[in-house]
Amino acid sequence: MNTIRYTLLTVLTLISFHIFAQPGVSAGNLQFTIKKMSDNVTFGVFVKPDATIAPSKRTSTGSGQVTLVTSKDFTYDNLVSKGGTWVENARVNSPIEAPDNAYISFGFVTDEPKIKLQSNEETLLFTFVPADDYDGSISLIENNNDPFSTPNSYGTNPGNDLGMMDFGVAGGIQYYTYANNYFEGMDNGPAILASEKTEAAQPKAIFAAEKGTASLRSPK
C-alpha cells in the first residue's frame, strides 16, 4: 500500500511540476554546458547543480529540453543518451530572426538511465557527433537573449529546461529547475557518466568567451 501511495504521489507531483518547469524559468538550481569529449570529435551536453543545493540520490526528473544553436548547414550522427533518454523533437532552419542559424531541440523522454546529480559535479546527459565537414559553431541557446526565443515567427518553443524533484532532503520535497548555461574557464569538476556510474575529468573545449560557443577546431 505504501508503494502504491508513493507511486501515485510521484505521478501527480510530476504532472504538476511539468506544468511549472518550462523553458524560460528565471530562477533555478541547474546549469547546462556543452563541450568536446576526450576524442576531440564527440560533443557532450552536461548538467551541474549550482552551489545552492546538495541533491540526494532520491531525485526524479519530470521534464527537460536542450536546444542547440548552430549554423544552418549543421548535421550530426550518433546521438547517445547518457543521463535520461533524449530524442530530437524539433528543428528550425534559417528563421527570419536569425537566418544564418539552425535551432535543434532535444526532448527528455524518460529518466532512464537515471540522471544522477552530485554537488559541484557534472552529469553527462547525451552526446552526438557533428558531420566531418562541419566547421561552424555549436552552442546552447540562451533562453532570455536569443533572437529566436519565444515568441518567434514559427510559433515554436525553443529553450533549455530541466525539472527535477528531490525526495531525499530534509524539509520535504525539493524542486530543481534549469537556471542558465555555464562555460569553460569555470571550475567544472569531474563528469559523471550516469549510465556507467564512473567519474572522469573532461577535457577543455575551445569556447568563444563572449558567446559561449564551442569551436570545432582542435586545441593548439
Please report, for each region that a protein language model flagged, where it lies by residue:
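Boundary/junction segments of secreted and surface-exposed precursor proteins
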Residues: 21-42, 177, 183-220
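Low-complexity, serine/threonine/proline/glycine-rich extracellular segments that form mucin-like
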Residues: 26-31, 35-91
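Structured beta-strand segments within beta-sheet-rich domains
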Residues: 46-47, 89-137
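Bacterial N-terminal signal peptides that target proteins for export
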Residues: 1-8
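A structural detector for beta-sheet-dominated domains
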Residues: 33-37, 46-48, 69-71, 107-109, ...
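Ser/Thr/Pro-rich, low-complexity mucin-like regions
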Residues: 117-173
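The transition from N-terminal targeting/processing segments to the mature protein
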Residues: 47, 57-59, 79-99, 117, ...
